[in-house]
Structures are given as structure tokens and as C-alpha cells.
Amino acid sequence: EEEAKLAEAQRLIDEREAKPVKQVFKASGGIVDFVKHLATGKDTIHTKVISMEARAPDAEADIALQWTNGYSESIHSFANTINTHEGGMHEEGLKKALTNVINRYARNKGLLKEKEENLLGEDVREGLIAIASVRLREPQFEGQTKTKLGNTTMRSLVETTVNEHLMTWLEEHPGDAKRIVTKSSQAAKARLAAKQARDL
């Protein structure tokens, strides 16, 4: 499991090895370096990590995304450097925007046919490594371990940021965008095939 403190330096404890390894990611690279670390050894779909940020008067958000050809999703979220293991509003905003943007782009470019159903969130997030880090004045932590962010303003801030920036990135990187949509479509087909097999 990875724990990170996202302040001036990013500290990551990687416990996947027998002996935990501590790494420090300087603020200049920040969560992009963190995502690169998590993607080490994986077959990535696009070469550069997609990064975006939002700056509001009383809140900030930084997001980094890397799609891989893997089958599991790996989403990590933070609020004021606290690892929000249970997710929360910032993570909800990220997931909603990802699904919305990939579907809109796929429809606009004819990569999803009219008769085909929209891709689900799980399809779009297959193989995705993502980090959402937000900073705000009065965080509301919920859940059993107080690691779930309850501020609804963070959902809209992250959602708006990803909706805008990811769509722009896809438009500017059509080759990578097509590969991401193809990966998501393959995940959808596998999901539907598995459902049909269960229903037999």
C-alpha cells in the first residue's frame, strides 16, 4: 500500500516489497512523479502523464492520470496531504468526469457507434493510475477512519477541472485518445461477455 504526504516534498512509503522503501518526490514533480513511480514496469498507453490543476480562492486541486494496459484501477486521493483511503467527494468528481469525458469524446469522434451503449465508469478506469490531491480551508472528514472527504465543493471543483482539461488533452493527442477509448471499449466488451456467460 502507498501512503503519501503531499506537502513541500512528497513522501511515499511503498510496502509492496518485503522491506518498505521510502521515496521522496520533490514538489516540482509532485504527483506526476508519484504516478510515474506507480506505473513503473507497467505497459503504458501514453508516454507522458496527463496532469491538470485548478486554483480557486479557497481551494486547489491537482490531478495526474496514466492509463496502462493493465486490468486493475489504482486511484489515490488526498485532502490537505491526508491520504483519503475511503475516497470522498473529490474522488467522486474525478470518476464522474472521467466517464463523462471519455464517452463524449468517443461519441464525437465516432469511436462509439450509435447502437453501442455508453461506457461505464469501470470500463473507463480499467488500467488507470490516478491521483487527485486537493487543498481546502475546512475539510470535513467522514467515515469510520475519518479518511473520507465530505466537502461537496471539492466534487464540483475536480469534476469541472477534469471535464475541461482532459477533453482538451484528448483533442490534442488523438492517437493516445483513440488507444484509451479502444482500451475502455475492450473492457466493456469483456464485461458484457462475462455477464452473458453468467446468464446462460
List the predicted regions and their residue ranges.
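GHKL-family ATPase ATP-binding module
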Residues: 1-200
